[in-house]
Amino acid sequence: MVMLMEQFIGIVKDILVLIASFGILLASYRLWIEKDRKNIIYARIHILGVIDCACFLIFIALGETLLAFVYLILAPFLAHAIAHAAYNDNLSE
């Protein structure tokens, strides 16, 4: 019975990794095809937020909880730094 439960948990982890990987591929494709226009940086940061969530789920599914926690803490700071740099950019468009 214990072995059956371990196999079930392994299958659930594999399915979670596949779904998150599909989300990463889909979000990456959207980043690639998106045309440049005004304030596109914020839309791209939003798409990267989807990728962040998928990566967080993958880390948890693979049992890397410490790495997932560090990633969860650092990802919003990185997104804010990118948005702040884009907002304060003094280059003309």
Curated annotation (Swiss-Prot):
Chief place of localization: membrane
UniProt entry keywords in alphabetical sequence: Cell membrane, Membrane, Transmembrane, Transmembrane helix
UniProt membrane topology term: Multi-pass membrane protein
Ranges annotated as spanning the membrane: 8-28, 54-74
GO terms for cellular component: plasma membrane
Subcellular localization, as worded in the UniProt entry: Cell membrane
NCBIfam families assigned to the protein according to its UniProt record, in alphabetical order: PRK06286.1-3
Protein name per its UniProtKB record: Uncharacterized protein MJ0292
Species classification: Archaea, Methanobacteriati, Methanobacteriota, Methanomada group, Methanococci
